[in-house]
């Protein structure tokens, strides 16, 4: 394992291994089966604001930080090799760090409440560059024509509860962020996600 984060279950909290995300296009594939990895942008600047809501409303709270997913599913954990790592490192080094803001609350049906990043273009471009380099791994298995960048705040809770949370959250927007790295994550046998590799943005090697 590489990196300083290991997202273990917090005491007194039950984890769900059936973490189905629902989009406006229909249900997305289950995340966290143990056979696939994920590439994410962590959004640590949002945690002080969204942690309390995620703890109550998001089943993945105990196993993942606040984040925006770039690509899932990605390679099986057993396929995370040095050659794959180097390819990702070189690809992401050509993408400069960027500012963004979480300024709007969005919904996938009544099941998922999320924060939408603005601008969304850098996240879309990152996903496009990664999938161009790894065409066997389209976002969500190629299930959708468009994948919307988002930070999940609540999933699967009662509608009234999530609507109330959205009203409270609105007072704290926008939340400003700065994307500096991409994390390659994979689930451990115990169910929590671990950082396998870190890829800084914008560090092109000079000859």
Model region roles, listed by residue range:
Residues 114-117:
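Generic recognition of long tandem-repeat/solenoid scaffolds
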Residues 106-112:
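Short, basic/glycine-rich phosphate-binding loops at helix/coil junctions
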Residues 3-99, 107, 119-180, 193-207:
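Basic, often amphipathic N-terminal segments
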Residues 110, 189-190:
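Short strand-connecting beta-turns/loops that link adjacent beta-strands
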Residues 180-189:
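Short beta-strand segments and strand-loop junctions that repeat across beta-rich extracellular domains
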